[in-house]
Each structure stands twice: as C-alpha cells, then as structure tokens.
Amino acid sequence: MNEHGFQMQSALDGNYISIALPASCRQDKIAVRVIKESCPEFLLSFGMTDINDRITLKYKVPNAVSLKYMNGSFTKQMFVDFYEGLLEPFVRGYDWFLDYHYVCVIPDYIFVDKQTIRSQFLYIPEQSYRNTDEEIIDFLKNVLNKVMVTDDSAFLVQLYQYFNGGNVVLSDLDNMIKAEKSKISPKPVMQGNTASAV
C-alpha cells in the first residue's frame, strides 16, 4: 500500500489523519458516497476537502490504541473476537459495495478499542492506495506474530499452518475463526440476588 501523504494532525476537538490524494486521482465515487451516508462500524468515516483540484481526506482518530502498539496475551475468546474484527472489512465490505483492496493495512492507522477489542480501519477510495491480495494476507499473518493465546496456543499454530499452506482464502479464514468462536462456551453471567425484602 502506498504510504505517501499520510499526516497526523491535532485540533481542539481531537486528532486527525489527513491524506492528500494525488493530483490526478481516480476515486471510487460509490465508496465515497457509501461511507458518507452509511459508514460501516469497522471503518472510520472521513471528510473531503477540494482545494485547487487537490483532494484531501480527513479521518477523526478514535479514542483507541493503534494496532502498531497492540500486542500481548489474549484469552482465546478475546483473540477470536479481535481477529474476527480484523477480518470484517475484508469479508463484509462487499455488503456496502466496498472493494476490500482499499482498506488500509498499515498497523499505525488501524485502531483497536481497548474495551470491545474491535478494530476500525481507514478506507482510501483511490487507485494508488490499492492493496494486493498478498499485502492483505501478509498483514493478517503478521498480526499473529504480535500476540499470544494463553489458553490455547495450539490454535495459533493451526492458524500459522493455514497461512503457510499457501492457499489462503479470506472467507475460509473467516469461517475458521467463526467455527472456533462457536466452540467457546460463553462465560456465565453473574446473577444478583433477586429476592425482595419484605
């Protein structure tokens, strides 16, 4: 992915990422409209400015940690939720007529909510920012190098074996994660004392 033109900016109302698009940019106008009108939760919405035929996209940075700094230990439940969120724009983007090749896979610009473990991505609807399938697969594989699953390390080994098999299909990977999620029994909810005092 093209990393040219990314700039962090601070303002009184928060932090922003600005991306100045090339002068002769070819935008995906359908994607621009979709994101402005009904942006999916896994993407950051953006504003656009056009000054002297130079278009700049401006994304407000959420109160979350950059994937670049996200590492450590996860329970299997947390990891499966986290990884399912990373896959979401690549397997569900077409539901919004979005091409997953334009989802930014640079870890600095992917934001993970510390509470929900869900990720938000930048979508850059311009041809020069298009990822190859190999770049997307490398991104998803490299995330595994930053984490450890404390209660099922064999599952990480299974994922590594899948990637090293060489025939990675995003929908198959998503199905693998969903299958593991269905095997994990939900934690019981603590019930309070429901007896009423007389």
Predicted regions and their residues:
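Short, Lys/Arg-enriched, disordered terminal segments
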Residues: M1-L12, P188-V198
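Conserved structural core of kinase catalytic domains
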Residues: N2-Y83
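"Short basic amphipathic alpha-helical interaction patches in structured regions
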Residues: N71-T75, G93, F97, L122-P125
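Short C-lobe core helix of eukaryotic-like protein kinase catalytic domains
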Residues: E84-D95
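A short glycine-rich, hydrophobically flanked beta-strand micro-motif that places a catalytic Asp/Glu
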Residues: L98-V112
